[in-house]
Curated annotation (Swiss-Prot):
Keywords: Aminoacyl-tRNA synthetase, ATP-binding, Cytoplasm, Ligase, Metal-binding, Nucleotide-binding, Protein biosynthesis, RNA-binding, tRNA-binding, Zinc. It comes from Burkholderia multivorans (strain ATCC 17616 / 249). GO terms for biological process: threonyl-tRNA aminoacylation. Homodimer. Pfam families: HGTP_anticodon, TGS, tRNA-synt_2b, tRNA_SAD. SUPFAM superfamilies: Class II aaRS ABD-related (SSF52954), Class II aaRS and biotin synthetases (SSF55681), TGS-like (SSF81271), ThrRS/AlaRS common domain (SSF55186). The gene is thrS. This is Threonine--tRNA ligase. It comes from the Bacteria. The keyword Transport does not apply. Residues 242-533 are annotated as: Catalytic. Its EC number is 6.1.1.3. GO terms for cellular component: cytosol.
Length: 635
């Protein structure tokens, strides 16, 4: 007798072992038809999985997030099936699920073209309509490797040969195609109805640039056509908002091959940067942080003591001078500990909050670089709080409130919070972890925030809160973190004198709100589509003269506004006013101030707001008041 507990708490009993599909059928024909897989005692399995013991089971359908993952994984295999049918000489490698879709890497003697993608997608549709059953069999490692070598699939054989001999190997087949995979997969190809191939890109075998170059075909798959249409529309919008395009269009920054992963900020882009940095500086100062500055290059011995040299060296830029090894800092924390250690600290000094707009460098792979979003040189709005264990909750509450307020000010209202909990391998006692995790929970609760818990995802030295902001297109970006660290103060010898005169280690809270300034600016540019709020805009207004006779008035007006602390320029070129208006409209300037003879004589301005809104003619003082009101409403 096998007893199976369902999500509603009911228990079904079966005389003999049953498959997930059979359980679904016993519940109802509709569920049997909709079943894509099952969650057996928390593990995702195929509908063909046999249950021979008492267990809990949830039937997975296309209404579940896991169901969509199964569909995408199976569509990646369908892609490989179609490619092998159309291009038998192509060799298959790997095909995982990624955000919003999947990809599959192929080795082929010529590049795949857009026309090839159309043919492949059409063949995928034909194969899906055949509704061929997807079957699974478990074989030994040697049998699997031998099979793939016999059909000339050297990459698959190499993957299998790297797997421990004792491991079971799963092979999935549909039609004439067999692939190595951990699964699970849909029960038949007819479940795959909504998909599209997106693009081809280069990739290296096993992600190593020393290996052969492969071709990576990206695709997307969904349960409903409306969802796919919405996603494709979002991609169109994202392309229009691409910060790399807007950076060029708005003359904010550029990047070039002579300095890969580093940013050349232009005057307007640097003005935007300064607004963000000055705002963040004001907020951390108000929150009781002390701003410091630490060296960019430090001796190897410090990085060895912190553990970075042993565990992070390949991502660090290193140099040598006078027979000493140095590294450019990839992060600011070891330097902050040195400031804390400089002098005797008392419990009365705690909490001690150090902030730094710290310039860091990481040796990211060139293929991973992506505009401002993934760079090698970046500045973090970094800070470290040194406190006692009893102060963790209060400091976490204060940080949560600060972070949420900052995100709102920048126009982000939807924040997802995730709490990463203890991993299996960790330092510290269970009691210490209990207190640390519960402290972070209490801090989130005190702020009225909801969160998702991620068991096992914390660092080995402490739990962590992550802040994921959603932009105007619904995309999620992780920006802020609050990481509790029980290790670094010990490794680097940080201590304070407790109330009983004993020496104790402080708890260290690593925290950032925007994270990488470069990346955050990229997110801001895309979120606002380059049309920055007035308080952030590099140029808040441009004065445009219609003819030569208004040049002096236009210059005087711009200077008057600049003296009020406003970011205003004058465009005095001998061009048609319609041309100048169009140009500055494309630059997304919040206000255009047009002056002709009438405005000059009356000491007024004709004001056009962003979006082509005509605000009419008004005295200069009235416009200044309007702009100041925009700024006051933000503050």
């Amino acid at each position: 007798m096998v007893s199976i507990r369902l999500p509603d708490g009911s228990v079904r009993q079966y005389e003999h072992p049953v498959t997930v599909a059979e359980v679904a059928a016993s519940i109802g024909p509709g569920l049997a038809k909709a079943a894509l897989g099952g969650k057996l005692d928390g593990e995702l399995v195929d509908t063909s999985a046999v249950i021979d013991h008492d267990a809990s089971l949830a039937i997975v359908t296309d209404k579940d997030p896991d169901g969509l993952d199964i569909i995408r994984h199976s569509t990646a295999h369908l892609l490989a099936y179609a490619v092998k049918e159309l291009y038998p000489d192509a060799q298959v490698t790997i095909g995982p699920v990624i955000d919003n879709g999947f990809y599959y890497d192929f080795a082929y003697h010529r590049p795949f073209t857009p026309e090839d993608l159309e043919k492949i997608e059409k063949r995928m549709q034909e194969l899906a309509k055949k509704d061929e059953p997807v079957t699974r069999r478990v074989v030994s490692r040697d049998e699997a490797a031998g099979y793939f070598r016999s059909i000339g699939e050297k990459y698959k054989a190499e993957i299998i040969e790297s797997i421990p001999e004792s491991d079971e190997i799963k092979l999935y087949s549909h039609g004439g195609f067999t692939d190595l995979c951990r699964g699970p997969h849909v029960p038949s190809t007819g479940k795959l109805k909504v998909f599209k191939l997106m693009k081809v890109a280069g990739a290296y075998w096993r992600g190593d640039s020393k290996n052969e170059q492969l071709q990576r075909i990206y695709g997307t798959a969904w349960t409903k056509k409306e969802d796919q249409d919405q996603y494709l529309h979002m991609l169109e919008e994202a392309e229009k908002r691409d910060h790399r395009k807007l950076g060029k269009q708005l003359d904010l920054f550029h990047m070039q091959e002579e300095s890969p992963g580093m940013v050349f900020w232009h005057p307007k882009g640097w003005a935007l940067w300064q607004q963000v940095e000055q705002y963040m500086r004001r907020r951390v100062n108000e929150a009781g942080y002390l701003e410091i500055k630490t060296p960019m290059i430090m001796d190897r011995s410090l990085w060895e003591a912190s553990g970075h040299w042993q565990n992070y060296r390949e991502n660090m830029f290193t140099t040598e001078s006078e027979k000493r090894d140095y590294a450019i800092k990839p992060m600011n924390c070891p330097g902050h500990v040195q400031v804390f250690k400089h002098g005797l600290r008392s419990y009365r000094d705690l909490p001690l909050r150090y902030a730094e707009f710290g310039s860091c460098h990481r040796n990211e792979a060139s293929g991973a670089l992506h505009g401002l979003m993934r760079v090698r040189g970046f500045v973090q709005d970094d800070a470290h709080i040194f406190c006692t264990e009893e102060q963790i909750i209060a400091e976490s509450i204060a940080f949560n409130k600060l972070a949420m307020s900052v995100y709102r000010d920048f126009g982000f209202d939807h924040i997802d919070i995730k709490l990463s909990l203890r991993p299996e391998q960790r330092m510290g006692s269970d009691e210490t972890w209990d207190r640390a995790e519960q402290g972070l929970r209490e801090a989130l609760t005190a702020c009225g925030l909801q969160w998702e818990e991620l068991p096992g995802e914390g660092a080995f030295y402490g739990p962590k809160i992550e802040y994921h902001i959603k932009d105007a297109l619904g995309r999620s970006w992780q920006c802020g973190t609050l990481q509790l660290d029980m290790m670094l103060p010990e490794r680097l010898g940080a201590e304070y004198v407790a109330e009983d005169n004993s020496r104790r280690r402080p708890v260290m809270l690593h925290r950032a709100i925007v994270g990488s300034m470069e990346r955050f600016l990229g997110i801001l540019i895309e979120h606002h589509a380059g049309a920055m709020p007035v308080w952030l805009a590099p140029v808040q207004a441009v004065v445009l003269n219609i003819a030569e006779s208004q040049v002096e008035y236009a210059q005087s007006l711009a200077q008057t506004l600049q003296k009020q602390g406003l970011r205003v320029t004058a465009d005095l070129r001998n061009e048609k006013i319609s041309y100048k208006i169009r140009e500055h409209t494309l630059e997304k300037v919040p206000y255009l101030l047009v002056v002709g003879d009438k405005e000059r004589d009356a000491q007024t301005v004709a004001v056009r707001a962003r979006g082509g809104v005509d605000l009419g003619v008004m005295p200069v003082e009235a416009f200044v008041e309007r702009l100041q009101e925009d700024l006051r409403s933000f503050k």
